[in-house]
Amino acid sequence: HHLQDESLTVIQGKIGALVAGQQPTYHGPGETVTFRRGEVHRFWNAGEDILICRGWAKPAYNLEFFLTEIYRSTKANGGKAPSAFDGAYLTSKYKTEFDLIGIPMFVRKVIFPITLLLGRLAGKYSRFEGAPEPVKA
């Protein structure tokens, strides 16, 4: 997140967290991991049990909408990743707020713009009508 601080407290399970340039850390129930705005990071379920966390992001801006749509698309697409059209749309529209570090630069700079154009021509984005406007950095 370019504009938000984020914090997660583990309720159940074990979370793995990685900040770019650092070693991974692992946290269990009652422990908290915090990421500062602009800090490239990722986190994952690092255990065998279900991971349940309580967290916050400040200021929230469009985080809830963005994550809800990414997860909705991922679920509809078989659970591995959002559809190419949804991924291209969401990462392009909200690029001032969020970045998904797992997507190669070539895909973001070349493939996504082509996919976005094809999606617009094919009418793939009608479900995003009324989506909140991105926050300007």
Place the predicted regions along the sequence by residue.
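Jelly-roll (double-stranded beta-helix
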Residues: 2-4, 9, 16-137
